[in-house]
Amino acid sequence: MTLDPKIAARLKRNADGLVTAVVQERGSGDVLMVAWMNDEALARTLQTREATYYSRSRAEQWVKGATSGHTQHVHSVRLDCDGDAVLLTVDQVGGACHTGDHSCFDAAVLLEPDD
C-alpha cells in the first residue's frame, strides 16, 4: 500500500524513516502505547483501520493483534503540528501492552498527582 503523497509530504521522519505513533483509547482517553510507523504502516492503517506499526527490532510491519487477538480498530488519525508524530484514537480489544496490561503505562508511576 502506498501513502497518499499529500500526507507523505507533511511527515517529518527520523533517520530511519519512521514517525512516532501515540495510541489513545477512544472513550476513556487513556494513552495505551507508543510505537513507530513507516509510510507503509501508516498507509495500511489509513486504508484498513487496523492499527499497523513498524517493529524496529524485527525490521518489519506488524498488525496489532494479528497474533494475540488484542486488536486496535482505528477510529481516527491525526498528525501533530510538527509532522513528526501521529495520534491514533482506537477501540482496544484486550491489552494494548505486550505484557498483557491494558496500557503500556500501567507499570510505574514516577510522580503521583498532587490533588
Swiss-Prot record:
Gene Ontology biological process terms from the UniProt entry: L-histidine biosynthetic process
A Pfam cross-reference name: PRA-CH
Keywords: Amino-acid biosynthesis, Cytoplasm, Histidine biosynthesis, Hydrolase, Magnesium, Metal-binding, Zinc
Keyword Oxidoreductase on entry: no
The keyword Zinc appears for this protein: yes
Gene3D superfamilies, per database record: Phosphoribosyl-AMP cyclohydrolase
One cellular component term from this protein's GO annotations in UniProt: cytoplasm
MF terms (GO), sorted A to Z: magnesium ion binding; phosphoribosyl-AMP cyclohydrolase activity; zinc ion binding
Binding site for Zn(2+): C81, C97, C104
Needed cofactors: Mg(2+); Zn(2+)
Cellular compartment(s): Cytoplasm
Residues binding Mg(2+): D80, D82, D84
Catalytic activity: 1-(5-phospho-beta-D-ribosyl)-5'-AMP + H2O = 1-(5-phospho-beta-D-ribosyl)-5-[(5-phospho-beta-D-ribosylamino)methylideneamino]imidazole-4-carboxamide
Pathway linked to the protein: Amino-acid biosynthesis; L-histidine biosynthesis; L-histidine from 5-phospho-alpha-D-ribose 1-diphosphate: step 3/9
EC number: 3.5.4.19
Entry note: cofactor: Binds 1 Mg(2+) ion per subunit. Binds 1 zinc ion per subunit.
Bilayer-spanning residue ranges: none
InterPro entries attached to this UniProt entry: PRA-CH, PRib_AMP_CycHydrolase_dom, PRib_AMP_CycHydrolase_sf
Domain of life the protein comes from: Bacteria
Purpose of the protein: Catalyzes the hydrolysis of the adenine ring of phosphoribosyl-AMP.
HAMAP family found in the cross-reference section: HisI (MF_01021)
Subunit structure, as described in the record: Homodimer.
Family classification: Belongs to the PRA-CH family.
Annotated protein name in UniProt: Phosphoribosyl-AMP cyclohydrolase
Gene: hisI
